[in-house]
Regions:
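A glycine-rich helix N-cap at a beta->alpha junction
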Residues: 154-169, 248-259, 288, 477, ...
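Intrinsically disordered, low-structural-confidence terminal and linker regions
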Residues: 1-51
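Active-site nucleophile and cofactor-binding loops and adjacent substrate-binding regions
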Residues: 98-114, 133-140, 186-205, 231-235, ...
Length: 801
C-alpha cells in the first residue's frame, strides 16, 4: 500500500497507549500482521474516527481483533466443509468416523477468499454502509457461506438449516457436496458448489471465469458501491476487462472496487502472476490501461479493510479532481492486488493440491492425513467465548444498516418503464427501423433508467443509426458528433465485453445488436445470467431487472456479402434450448411484427429475448392488429385455401415466409388446399419441461386452432437448422412420416438471399418438392420439368429465383 504511513517506533508507542491495538497486533494462528498492514490499520482507524464513522480508536481496534477471530473460524469451517461431517467448536480433534468418505471442495481458492470476504464485511461494519459484492471465482463459495453463517447474514432457508450453532454447522458440512436431491430432482440443500440464489447477497454464479471482470464496472448505479473479487487465473481470460477505465463515469456509474486474489496458481500449474516478474508486469499493464494498482497482503483480512477503504478514498479524490478540471476521463481506477498463496491457512498451501484436496490422503481412512487435518485445523481454532464475542460485536455495530444479503444490487427492481407510442407502418422497410425508433424514444421517455447499448462496431450498418445519433459511442476523446464522453453505447470488437455491459446494467434499459453469426461469442455470458435468474425464480425470489433484446441481425440468410463464417444459426438454436420462460426466441417477419414485440420485452422482469431480425427492407405482411395478435400468441394464420386433404405450411423467419407464400401460390394454382401459418415464437409450441415453462407455452386450444389435427401433412420451413427445429417442435410435427422440415444445412458462401436458399434446399421449389412427397405425387405435378430439374441439382438454379 503506497501511502504515507507511521513509522515502527510510532506504532510501538501507539500500542503502549492503546491496549486494543496491542491486542490486535498479536494476530491469531497463521493470521499475522505485517509492518505495512499494522501501519495501514493505524491510519485507517484514525481516518474512521475523524470522519465520525467510529466513536474512538479502541472501538476500531476491537473490531479488527474480532475480524481476526471470525476469519480464523471461517478458515477452519472451510476445511471442515471439504473433509468433515462434523465440527467440534470445543477444539477437540476429529476421529475417523467424523470425516467424509468422499471429500470434495475447491479448498485453496475458498481459503483465499475468507480474508477477502471477511474484510469486506468488516469494512461495512466500520463505515455503517452496506456495499455489494461480486465474486468471479464462484467455486470459492464455501468462504462466503462460512462467514455468512458466522455473521448471521442468511436467507430464511439457510437460517433454518445452518444458524443453530454446532448442529447447524454440522448440517452445513454434510450438505456441502452432499448431493441430496428433492423428489423433483432438484438439489435438496439450500447450498451449492458455486454462488447461487441461496447465497446471501450473491448476484452471479461466477462459474464462467472472466465474466465478472467484464461486468463489475457496469453494475453499480450512482450512490452504490460494489466490491468485485477477481481471479488471477481469469486475468488470462478476457482482454475486455482491461478496458474498464474507458467505460467508467462518475455521472452514471457507482463506485466499483476490483480486487484480484493473486494466489499464483490455477488448477494444474502456476499462473504468470505466480512469478515476481509476472506480477510486476501485470501492474505495469494495469497502469497502461488506466488502472491504479495497489498491492497488499492478501493473507490478512485487515489489509483488505484498509485497501478497500483507501481505494474508495482515492477514487473519490480522482472524481473531485476531475470536477475541478485537474483530471479528465479516463480516471485512474484503483485496482487491489491481494498477494497470497493458494490455500493459505491450511496444509499444502502453495501446491497444486491446494486447489481441491490439499491433504495427502483422506482423513476418513488415512491416519497421517487425519493427524495433519487436526493439527492445522487446531491452529485456526477460536475459543467459543471469544468467537461469540466477535460475532456479537459485528452484529451490534450493524445497527439499522441492511444486511449484505439485502444490498441494492441483490435487490434490483427498477421502476416500470414508460412505453412510447407504437408507430406501425404500411410500407416496405427494414424491420430494424422499428427497434431503432422505439428504443430511442424509450430511453428519452425514461431518463431515470440508465441506458446501455452493446455494440460490436456495426450499429449503423445494422440500421440502428437513430440509436447511435441519440446515445453516441462512449469515448474519452470524441472525434465526431456520434461520440461523447457521456455516450451510452459501449463499442468494442469484443462481443463478450459489450454484452456484459448490458447484462450487468440490471438497473436500466439495454439493447445489444450484432451479426447473428457473431452472437455465438456471447452465449456463455448470456447463459450464466439466464441460469442464475431461473434459479432465483425457483427459490421464490425472482429477478427484478427489466427484460431486453439480444438482436441477431445481418443474419444467416442475408449475409451472403461475406463468407460462411458470417452464416450461422447457432445462437438462436442454443437459446431455444434454454428455458422458454427465461429467454424468448423470436423471429419477426416485418417492421410491425418486430415493433409489437418490444413493449412486452421491456416490461418483463428477469427475462431476455433473442430477436432474429432482418436488416434489409422487407414488405409489410402484418397490420397492427395482426402484429399484436402474433406477439401475444406466437403464431398466426396468414392465409388458407379450403378443400380436402389440406397441407399445413409453417414458416419460421421472414425470408422463409416469403418462400412459403410463393410455394402456396403454386399450390393454389394446382388446386391443392393448404393452410399457411407464420411461427414467430417456436418456444411457445414446445413440450414444457417443468411447471415454470408451462406458463410460457401456448394452451391446447390455441395449438389446435393454429395447427389443427385434421391437417396431418405438414411442411416447416425454418430459419434454423431443420433438425433443431424438428426436435423442439415435435408437438406440432407429431408424425415424422407425414412431415417435412427444411432449413439451414450448413451451406453458404458469397451468395445472395436466393442463392443461400437454393444452396440449403430451402427455397420455394424445395418446399413444393416436399409437398409433392407428402401428397405422393410427382414433383412435376407442382413444378415444371425445368424447375424440378433445378430442385434435383441437375438444372439452372436461376429458374427458382
Amino acid at each position: 500500500m503506497s501511502q504515507i504511513l507511521p513509522s515502527q517506533d510510532e506504532l510501538l508507542a501507539h500500542a503502549a497507549a492503546e491496549p486494543a491495538f496491542a491486542a490486535w497486533l498479536q494476530g491469531h494462528g497463521p493470521l499475522q500482521h505485517s509492518a505495512e498492514t499494522r501501519a495501514a490499520v493505524f491510519r485507517t482507524a484514525h481516518q474512521l474516527v475523524q470522519a465520525g464513522l467510529q466513536p474512538d480508536l479502541a472501538s476500531v481496534y476491537q473490531l479488527f481483533r474480532a475480524l481476526d477471530r471470525l476469519t480464523a473460524s471461517a478458515l477452519r469451517i472451510v476445511v471442515h466443509m471439504t473433509y468433515a461431517r462434523r465440527i467440534r467448536l470445543d477444539g477437540q480433534p476429529l476421529q475417523a468416523e467424523d470425516f467424509k468418505t468422499q471429500p470434495e471442495g475447491h479448498t485453496g481458492g475458498a481459503l483465499n477468499m475468507v480474508p477477502a470476504y471477511a474484510g469486506y464485511l468488516a469494512l461495512n461494519v466500520l463505515t455503517g454502509k452496506t456495499r455489494a459484492w461480486l465474486m468471479g471465482q464462484g467455486h470459492c463459495v464455501a468462504a462466503i457461506d462460512a462467514l455468512n453463517v458466522l455473521t448471521g447474514n442468511l436467507h430464511p432457508e439457510q437460517e433454518r438449516a445452518y444458524a443453530d450453532g454446532e448442529e447447524g454447522l454440522n448440517r452445513l458440512l454434510q450438505d456441502f457436496y452432499g448431493y441430496a436431491q428433492a423428489p423433483n430432482g432438484a438439489p435438496a440443500a439450500p447450498l451449492g458448489s458455486h454462488v447461487n440464489p441461496h447465497t446471501a447477497g450473491g448476484i452471479a454464479e461466477g462459474g464462467y471465469l472472466g465474466f465478472a471482470e467484464l461486468q463489475y464496472a457496469h453494475m453499480p448505479l450512482p450512490g452504490e458501491t460494489l466490491v468485485a473479487f477477481l481471479s488471477d487465473g481469469a486475468a488470462e481470460e478476457q482482454r475486455g476487462s482491461d478496458w474498464i477505465p474507458r467505460w467508467w463515469r462518475a455521472e452514471d456509474c457507482g463506485v466499483a472496487l476490483p480486487v484480484m486474489i493473486a494466489n499464483g496458481r490455477r488448477i494444474e500449474q502456476r499462473t504468470e502472476l505466480g512469478t515476481h516478474e509476472g506480477l510486476e508486469g501485470f501492474k505495469l499493464h494495469l497502469r497502461r490501461c488506466g488502472f491504479d494498482p495497489i498491492s497488499f497482503d492478501g493473507r490478512d483480512p485487515a489489509a483488505f479493510v484498509c485497501t478497500l477503504w483507501e481505494m474508495e478514498q482515492r477514487l473519490e479524490r480522482r472524481v473531485q479532481e476531475k470536477n475541478s478540471g485537474i483530471l479528465r476521463y479516463p480516471l485512474p481506477i484503483p485496482y487491489g492486488i491481494a498477494e497470497t498463496v493458494k490455500g493459505f491457512g491450511f496444509y499444502g498451501a502453495g501446491s497444486n493440491a491446494a486447489h481441491n484436496l490439499p491433504l495427502p490422503g483422506n482423513p476418513h481412512n488415512d491416519e497421517q492425513a487425519r493427524q495433519l487435518f487436526n493439527q492445522h485445523a487446531n491452529e485456526l481454532w477460536v475459543e467459543p467465548e471469544a468467537l461469540e464475542l466477535a460475532r456479537r460485536l459485528f452484529a451490534e455495530q450493524r445497527g439499522e444498516r441492511p444486511l449484505e444479503r439485502d444490498n441494492p444490487l441483490a435487490l434490483r427492481h427498477p421502476i416500470e418503464p414508460i412505453i412510447p407510442p407504437l408507430r406501425y407502418r404500411d410500407d416496405a422497410c427494414s424491420p430494424m427501423a422499428a427497434l431503432d425508433r422505439f428504443y430511442t424514444e424509450l430511453v428519452e421517455a425514461n431518463p431515470d433508467l440508465r441506458a446501455r447499448v452493446g455494440n460490436p462496431d456495426e450499429l449503423a450498418s445494422n440500421r440502428l443509426g437513430g440509436v447511435l445519433k441519440a446515445l453516441k459511442h462512449r469515448v474519452s476523446e470524441p472525434e465526431s458528433e456520434l461520440e461523447s464522453v457521456s455516450g451510452r453505447v459501449i463499442t468494442a470488437l469484443n462481443e463478450e465485453a459489450v454484452v456484459s455491459a448490458c447484462l450487468a446494467n440490471q438497473g436500466g434499459l439495454n439493447l445489444v445488436a450484432s451479426y447473428e453469426a457473431f452472437c455465438v461469442k456471447m452465449l456463455g455470458a448470456v447463459r450464466q445470467t439466464l441460469i442464475f435468474a431461473r434459479q432465483q425464480k425457483e427459490v421464490g425470489r425472482p429477478a427484478g431487472w427489466l427484460g431486453w433484446p439480444l438482436v441477431a441481425t445481418s443474419h444467416t440468410w442475408e449475409n451472403g456479402k461475406n463468407q460462411q463464417s458470417h452464416q450461422d444459426t447457432t445462437f438462436c438454436e442454443a437459446l431455444l434450448g434454454e428455458m422458454s420462460d427465461m429467454v424468448r426466441v423470436l423471429f419477426p417477419a416485418d417492421h410491425n411484427s418486430a415493433l409489437a414485440l418490444l413493449p412486452t420485452i421491456y416490461r418483463s422482469r428477469g427475462q431476455l429475448a433473442c430477436l432474429v431480425i432482418p436488416k434489409r427492407d422487407r414488405p409489410m405482411v402484418f397490420d397492427a392488429v395482426q402484429a399484436e395478435r402474433l406477439a401475444r400468441d406466437g403464431a398466426i394464420l396468414v392465409e388458407e385455401r379450403c378443400g380436402s386433404d389440406p397441407l399445413l405450411l409453417i414458416a419460421n423467419g421472414s425470408y422463409q415466409l416469403e418462400q412459403m407464400r410463393r410455394a402456396a401460390q403454386r399450390l393454389a394454382e394446382a388446386g391443392q388446399a393448404y393452410r399457411l401459418v407464420y411461427l414467430q415464437e417456436p418456444g411457445r409450441f414446445r413440450a414444457p419441461r417443468d411447471r415454470w415453462e408451462v406458463e410460457a407455452v401456448a394452451d391446447e386450444a390455441l395449438v389446435e386452432r393454429l395447427f389443427p389435427d385434421s391437417h396431418e401433412r405438414r411442411v416447416l420451413l425454418t430459419h434454423m437448422r431443420a433438425e433443431v427445429a424438428r426436435g423442439h417442435l415435435w408437438p406440432i410435427l407429431p408424425d415424422a412420416r407425414r412431415t417435412s422440415v427444411l432449413g439451414y444445412r450448413n451451406r453458404g458462401g458469397t451468395l445472395d438471399e436466393a442463392g443461400m436458399q437454393f444452396a440449403n434446399r430451402a427455397c420455394w421449389g424445395n418446399v413444393l418438392a416436399a409437398c409433392a412427397r407428402l401428397m405422393e405425387v410427382p414433383r412435376t405435378a407442382l413444378l415444371t420439368p425445368e424447375e424440378a430439374a433445378a430442385v434435383a441439382g441437375k438444372g439452372d438454379p436461376a429458374l427458382l429465383r
